[in-house]
């Protein structure tokens, strides 16, 4: 990827794509922002609206609508296109429809001569990220999904409300599927550098008996709690995409829980799942392998097995 440019394309200008675009423009993450949608006029409208807010920011981002052909010079292509789950469905239930969309999208982007980084949010994001890797032929470090980045943020928010601590002082990750089977590596969750398991043990009088499984379930179901109230989620995932894109351009070696293709890490091969990874200008610099407990390894493996079973339904 060229290191003297900052150009991003967003494919899909629905609520997630437009929220991501808004975050990118407000933060001045890129110099050029290309919007692509099956409804071209929708993309044109979003580009116009975003351009009109430039005077109220400290940045100058060129925002315009275009087509796949324009992706040739992009550094990052963000894909948010895909169907939203209907009531009662899981993210995995949208796989068939999402997979068909990706075949068209990735084919169009790659035909342009694109040679940058794919950043995915389309659900089920772990499997779709794997599919895009296969379809694109790009190195695995340059195909990244949002994975459990948002889940990890939700986890920290839930813990911060429980412990009365700023969520930015809490460190830890949800791993595995961005969905119902995700797990938390509790042995690596810290608050101000102190293990949370130690804190909960020492302060039982203050916090009582905390059911960690309930916290995991609350984290995994957070999206559905939002869905029940407003129909879908977009601010959190939009900001997650912008955050990852910023980390790529800034080459800041930030550790983020993303969908990454494993090739021996955690003893897994030919699988895309949510794991912490070091993000740089080249994409994923390194996958961080946490030393999981036996119970955590088992939960992580179960989540990965679910992903593998669904991968088979689209030929992988």
Swiss-Prot record:
Subcellular location as annotated: Cytoplasm
What is the main EC category here? oxidoreductase
Q: Does the keyword Cytoplasm apply?
A: yes
Q: Which reaction does it catalyse?
A: (S)-lactate + NAD(+) = pyruvate + NADH + H(+)
PROSITE patterns this protein is in?
A: L_LDH
Q: Which UniProt keywords apply?
A: Allosteric enzyme, Cytoplasm, NAD, Oxidoreductase
Please name the catalytic residues of this protein: 178
- Please give the function described in this protein's UniProt entry: Catalyzes the conversion of lactate to pyruvate.
Q: What is this protein called?
A: L-lactate dehydrogenase 3
Q: Which organism is it from?
A: Bacillus cereus (strain ATCC 10987 / NRS 248)
Gene name, please? Answer: ldh3
